[in-house]
C-alpha cells in the first residue's frame, strides 16, 4: 500500500490525435507547480495522472493545494495505491474506513466502483456490493446510506487499484502554455485580473501591462498591481509585469484634446503600447477586462474605435458578463479584496465628466493628429519597468 495523488483532467480527452501533446504539457506544468515539495514520479495511464512521492514526509496537503490551481486539472484526490486483488482491496478498504471514522466520526457510507481493468473477474456493481458487505461486517458501527452518506468510498480498479474518499475540485480549463501567449492590460480594478485569469484558463500564457501615472497615482497603487499579479501567478506560475510610465501621455492628451474624448484617446494609446510589448514578447493577442456597456469607453462604438488602432486581435473574456458575475469570480480566485483597496490607477485620473459614448473614428484620429504621440509612446516603452512575478 502506498499513498499517491490521483489527477483527473477533462477537456484534454476531446483532443483526438493531439491529446498526447496536451497531456505532456499538463504533466510538465504539474511538475513545475510542485517541484519544491520534493522528488516525485509522475505517470499517466487511462486518462489519469498519478503522482508518487519518492521521499518520506511528503507534504500532501500543500501538493493538493497547489495542484488545485493548475489549469487543465478537473480534480485531485489523495489515494491509496494497492494491488488489484480483491482480498487486498477488502483489507485496505477496512483500514481506510476505520481511519476515517476515528478522524471524522462518520456513521454512514456507500461504495462507488469504476473497473477500468476488464480482466478483473468482478464487474463494478458486484465489487461495490461485496466490498460494502465486507465493510459492514468488519465495521459494525457503520451503516449504508446510498442517497446521503457521510462519505463515499471510491474504488478504481485498473492495473493497480486506487481507493479514496476525498475529491478536491480544481480549476479545469486547458494546460497553461498550450494556446500561445497574450498581453493583459492590467489595472488595479476588479475586472482585468478576472479577464486575465479567464484567458489563462484557456491555456494562454500572460504578459501583464500596467500603466502607471506617478505622481498622480501613488506607490501604493503600483504595489497593489504587483500584489494582483502575484495572486494571478499562483495560477499562472510566472508572469512578466510591464509597468509603463504613462503620465506624460496623459498630460499631453489632457492639454490638447477635447475633454469628452480623453478616455477613448487614452485607451487607444494604451492599446498601441500593449501591441508594441506584445510584438516584443511574442504575444499574439491583447486581453482587456471590458464588458459591453459597463462604462462610456465600453459601448460598442467605443470598442470599435479602440480596436481600430491595433492590428492584433483583442480578447475580452468579460464581454457579456455583469458586474455581479465578475465579482463572484474575483472572490473565488482571490483577487477581489486586493482590487477594492482604495488606491487610484491611471484610469481614475484625468477623467472626463461627460465622455463621449458614440465616438467617430475620423474625429478621434483628427484629435490625435495634434499630439506628439509617436515620440511619447516610444519614450514610455523605452522606460518600461519589467518585473518577473512567480508563484514561489
From Swiss-Prot:
It is found in: Cytoplasm. It catalyses: [ThiI sulfur-carrier protein]-S-sulfanyl-L-cysteine + a uridine in tRNA + 2 reduced [2Fe-2S]-[ferredoxin] + ATP + H(+) = [ThiI sulfur-carrier protein]-L-cysteine + a 4-thiouridine in tRNA + 2 oxidized [2Fe-2S]-[ferredoxin] + AMP + diphosphate; [ThiS sulfur-carrier protein]-C-terminal Gly-Gly-AMP + S-sulfanyl-L-cysteinyl-[cysteine desulfurase] + AH2 = [ThiS sulfur-carrier protein]-C-terminal-Gly-aminoethanethioate + L-cysteinyl-[cysteine desulfurase] + A + AMP + 2 H(+). Keywords: ATP-binding, Cytoplasm, Nucleotide-binding, RNA-binding, Thiamine biosynthesis, Transferase, tRNA-binding. It is an enzyme of class 2 (transferase). Its main location: cytoplasm. ATP binds at residues 185-186, 210-211, 267, 289, 298. The keyword Cell inner membrane does not apply. Its EC number is 2.8.1.4. GO terms for cellular component: cytosol. One of its GO terms (biological process) is tRNA 4-thiouridine biosynthesis. Gene3D superfamilies: 3.30.2130.30, HUPs. Pathway: Cofactor biosynthesis; thiamine diphosphate biosynthesis. Residues 61-168 form the THUMP domain. NCBIfam families: tRNA uracil 4-sulfurtransferase ThiI. PANTHER family: TRNA SULFURTRANSFERASE. Catalyzes the ATP-dependent transfer of a sulfur to tRNA to produce 4-thiouridine in position 8 of tRNAs, which functions as a near-UV photosensor. Also catalyzes the transfer of sulfur to the sulfur carrier protein ThiS, forming ThiS-thiocarboxylate. This is a step in the synthesis of thiazole, in the thiamine biosynthesis pathway. The sulfur is donated as persulfide by IscS. This is Probable tRNA sulfurtransferase. It comes from Acetivibrio thermocellus (strain ATCC 27405 / DSM 1237 / JCM 9322 / NBRC 103400 / NCIMB 10682 / NRRL B-4536 / VPI 7372). The gene is thiI.
Amino acid at each position: 500500500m502506498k499513498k499517491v495523488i490521483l489527477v483527473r483532467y477533462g477537456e484534454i480527452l476531446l483532443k483526438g490525435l493531439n491529446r498526447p501533446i496536451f497531456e505532456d504539457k499538463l504533466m510538465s506544468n504539474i511538475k513545475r507547480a510542485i517541484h519544491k515539495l520534493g522528488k516525485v514520479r509522475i505517470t499517466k495511464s487511462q486518462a489519469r495522472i498519478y503522482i508518487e512521492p519518492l521521499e518520506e514526509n511528503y507534504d500532501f496537503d500543500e501538493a493538493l493545494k497547489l495542484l488545485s490551481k493548475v489549469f487543465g486539472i478537473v480534480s485531485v484526490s489523495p489515494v491509496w495505491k494497492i494491488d488489484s486483488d480483491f482480498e487486498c482491496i477488502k483489507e485496505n478498504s477496512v483500514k481506510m474506513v476505520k481511519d476515517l471514522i476515528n478522524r471524522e466520526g462518520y456513521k454512514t457510507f456507500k461504495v462507488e466502483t469504476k473497473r477500468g481493468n476488464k480482466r478483473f473477474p468482478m464487474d463494478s456493481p458486484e465489487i461495490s456490493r461485496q466490498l460494502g458487505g465486507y465493510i459492514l461486517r468488519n465495521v459494525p458501527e457503520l451503516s449504508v446510506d446510498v442517497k446521503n452518506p457521510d462519505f463515499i468510498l471510491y474504488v478504481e480498479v485498473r492495473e493497480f487499484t486506487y481507493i479514496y474518499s476525498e475529491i478536491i475540485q480544481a480549476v479545469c480549463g486547458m494546460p497553461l502554455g498550450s494556446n500561445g501567449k497574450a498581453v493583459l492590460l492590467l489595472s488595479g480594478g476588479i475586472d482585468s485580473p478576472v479577464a486575465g485569469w479567464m484567458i489563462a484558463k484557456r491555456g494562454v500564457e500572460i504578459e501583464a501591462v500596467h500603466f502607471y501615472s506617478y505622481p498622480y497615482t501613488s506607490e501604493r497603487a503600483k504595489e497593489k498591481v504587483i500584489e494582483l499579479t502575484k495572486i494571478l501567478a499562483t495560477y499562472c506560475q510566472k508572469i512578466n509585469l510591464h509597468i509603463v510610465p504613462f503620465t506624460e501621455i496623459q498630460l499631453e492628451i489632457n492639454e490638447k484634446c477635447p475633454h469628452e474624448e480623453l478616455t477613448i484617446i487614452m485607451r487607444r494609446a494604451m492599446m498601441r503600447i500593449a501591441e508594441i510589448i506584445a510584438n516584443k514578447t511574442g504575444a499574439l493577442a491583447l486581453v482587456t477586462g471590458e464588458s459591453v456597456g459597463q462604462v462610456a469607453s465600453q459601448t460598442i462604438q467605443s470598442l470599435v474605435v479602440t480596436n481600430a488602432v491595433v492590428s492584433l486581435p483583442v480578447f475580452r473574456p468579460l464581454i457579456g458578463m455583469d458586474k455581479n458575475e465578475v465579482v463572484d469570480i474575483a472572490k473565488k480566485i482571490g483577487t477581489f479584496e486586493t482590487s477594492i483597496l482604495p488606491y487610484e490607477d491611471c484610469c481614475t485620473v484625468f477623467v472626463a465628466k461627460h465622455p463621449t459614448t458614440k465616438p467617430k473614428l475620423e474625429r478621434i484620429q483628427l484629435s490625435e493628429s495634434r499630439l506628439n504621440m509617436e515620440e511619447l509612446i516610444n519614450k514610455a516603452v523605452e522606460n518600461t519597468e519589467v518585473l518577473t512575478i512567480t508563484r514561489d
